Curated annotation (Swiss-Prot):
Ranges that cross the membrane: none
Annotated gene: THI2
Domain of life, per lineage: Eukaryota
Region described as Disordered: 1-23, 210-234
Name of the protein in question: Thiamine biosynthesis regulatory protein
Single GO biological process annotation from the record: positive regulation of transcription by RNA polymerase II
Length: 450
């Protein structure tokens, strides 16, 4: 009996000395507690910590791409001086003041006010802090995307709703509209996708944002701005020309440039866009739009033949064939045969053919085509653009490397078939020497400049 009582006492002491288990970290508190990294008891409508510290308690849903952190606050003089120096070469329309940003976005705080009194307090505090030296900038393109998205998801300023149910329903509707919009075939419409569904907010359109903005992209942005400025006043018979260039051709190049080292270069892209703007006619631009609108692989060879028959200019043919190859690749045997015949007929390498040459080198194993490509690069006239000589040297290295690999494969096949490899080994040594010379030339002339 005594031992049993002692055991019960020891169990009670041990249980009382145990530390109560701590709760794990939660991710469902109000926004004020999340920002201050404190534990929220999630009381509604105001948690105890927000009530104690006088913070604005909000459980509203926020989309990450609508946050106010898309602008940069310049708090230090060093950052301000650097930004001021960089801004001298940029147009003034690319910057807006803090007060102007607030007026254009109708955005006062991260979450809606819980009462009219709270809204007036925030307005007064904003007005008192505006004249300080800390300013921030935002690009015009981001401002437009932000301004459009707020109205399309959360509703207008008077009927704005941040609740989870409203946002889930609205996003489902918009995404369904995007899917339906892509599936609809409308010959009169040149653009599909989210930008035709997430409509602009007409109340926020001002004279400062009336300039046409370039499509988002990689290194093509500066060239697109040049083209947009030059085409801002088009003739009446070429109204659809700008839509085709901006809505179709630029989009195709942007999504497919990463597999082509020529289209991925800003210098070549600038030249390419200027070439289209200055030399291509409205009829030919519409033909390019027809190539993009008709992705049927069976029509690729027909469009190829139509281009060769209608236009004799090698530059125009190169641009059209490049668009066909970008869209269809080497999945169409008839298109590949036509491309081979057309390329072998070329006696002079034009600068407009460079993206096509890059596609051919990366996708063909035909030695005749590679030899012809190497010969064209060796005899190219480097007068169309100052950057042409460097790209020519890079393509020369690429094609000789491709020839070296082709002869290595040939020798391996001959060894497996117990055939004589004397001639193949001679060819391999020759192209290895050519590759070494081309690489050394590029390294000495261009790599040292970088």
């Amino acid at each position: 009996m005594v031992n049993s009582k002692r055991q019960q006492r020891s169990k009670k002491v041990a249980s009382s000395s145990k530390v109560p288990p701590t709760k794990g970290r939660t991710f469902t508190g109000c926004w004020a507690c999340r920002f201050k990294k404190r534990r929220c008891d999630e009381n509604r409508p105001i948690c105890s910590l927000c009530a104690k510290h006088g913070d604005n308690c909000s459980y509203d849903i926020r989309l990450m791409w609508l946050e106010e952190n898309i602008y940069k606050v310049r708090k230090h003089s060093l950052i301000s001086s650097l930004q001021a120096r960089k801004s001298k070469s940029k147009p003034l329309c690319q910057k807006i003041s803090k007060s102007r940003f607030k007026q254009m976005t109708h955005f006062r705080q991260l979450s809606p006010p819980t009462s009219d009194c709270e809204d007036s307090v925030h307005e007064a505090s904003k007005e008192t802090t505006l004249p300080n030296d800390n300013t921030f900038t935002i690009s015009v393109r981001r401002l437009k995307i932000y301004n459009n998205a707020v109205a399309s998801v959360f509703g207008s300023m008077t009927n704005r709703d941040y609740t989870q149910k409203r946002i889930d329903k609205k996003l489902d509707e918009l995404l369904n509209m995007v899917e339906n919009d892509i599936s609809v075939v409308n010959l009169n419409c040149s653009k599909h996708g989210p930008y035709s569904v997430f409509r602009a907010n007409p109340a926020a359109v001002t004279s400062a944002l009336t300039d046409q903005l370039p499509s988002p992209g990689h290194s093509m942005s500066s060239a697109e701005e040049t083209t947009t400025a030059a085409l801002s006043s088009p003739p009446e018979d070429s109204t659809s020309l700008i839509d085709i260039i901006q809505g179709k051709i630029f989009g195709i190049l942007w999504f497919n440039c990463y597999g082509n080292m020529i289209l991925n270069r800003q210098e070549y892209t600038t030249w390419f866009i200027n070439k289209m703007r200055n030399s291509l006619t409205t009829e030919f631009i519409r033909f390019l739009g027809k190539i993009i609108d008709d992705p049927d692989i069976n029509m690729a060879s027909c469009l190829f033949k139509e281009c060769i028959a209608r236009w004799s200019c090698v530059d125009w043919q190169s641009i059209a064939i490049t668009m066909l190859v970008i869209i269809h690749g080497y999945t169409c045997p008839n298109l590949t045969k036509l491309l081979r015949v057309w390329f072998l007929q070329q006696k002079l390498l034009r600068f407009s053919m460079y993206p096509l040459v890059n596609f051919i080198i990366n996708n063909t194993q035909d030695l005749d085509v590679l030899y012809h490509c190497n010969g064209l690069l060796g005899n190219a006239d480097l007068f169309e653009d100052p950057y042409q000589d460097e790209l020519t040297s890079e393509l020369h290295v690429l094609v000789t490397e491709r020839l070296v690999n082709s002869w290595k494969d040939t020798i391996l096949q001959q060894l497996c078939s117990c055939q004589d490899t004397t001639l193949s080994c001679s060819q391999l040594r020759y192209w290895q020497l050519q590759l070494k010379c081309n690489q050394q030339f590029y390294k000495d002339v261009y790599a040292m400049q970088d």
